[in-house]
């Protein structure tokens, strides 16, 4: 029997048409929450919308556009009356080295991954401060902590949101608002498909999405879907460069042996 929330929450998620975000939405709806999804594509959510017409809002929105996010937040509050939790899950991942990446690419990735998180925060913080509570979660990545080869635009953007979340947590704790980071493992999603890593070493997006949704109320600053992932992240935070170099060597070895 599924455990229902004592008081249904209103949760807005930017980037949830597929992968980890989709399974977060599905799990949260099944457990009684009200969900608003902002994404540039919404096709995969049609069935969920049919099953939960009164508890799921889907809004076409681009994480890189201020007005889209502002309008999505306003529409969510208009229909559901409040927002308890906001999640920035949209991301753009590229697999180029620094020498193959121009400023335009860095700006494009930062605009979605970092400034997208900031956009959501700026759109929703005035509302949360007024209501006196709320939590905002950014989906981060281990490479934002450790570094990694041929992925510096993406890794840099994730490193930036690590610092942003810490700063905004300090600034907003007096309002009853907390900031957190989701830290999923390497997951079998479209964005990770180009990595030369055997699929059997990647986590299931359903397992990760459901696990993160289950812990969405965690008081921990870093939220993981499982105990083993939490232990791995402890190592990454304690020995960042060592872990980054080790993972890069392992990935390079897998690529040289034809692991896809």
Task: Show which residues each predicted segment covers.
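Conserved glycine-rich cofactor-binding loop
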Residues: 17-18
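Rossmann-fold cofactor-recognition segment
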Residues: 52-66
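Conserved NAD(P)H cofactor-binding loop of Rossmann-fold oxidoreductase domains
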Residues: 89-94
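Residue(s) in the substrate-gating loop at a strand-loop-helix junction
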Residues: 141
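C-terminal helical subdomain
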Residues: 181, 197-233
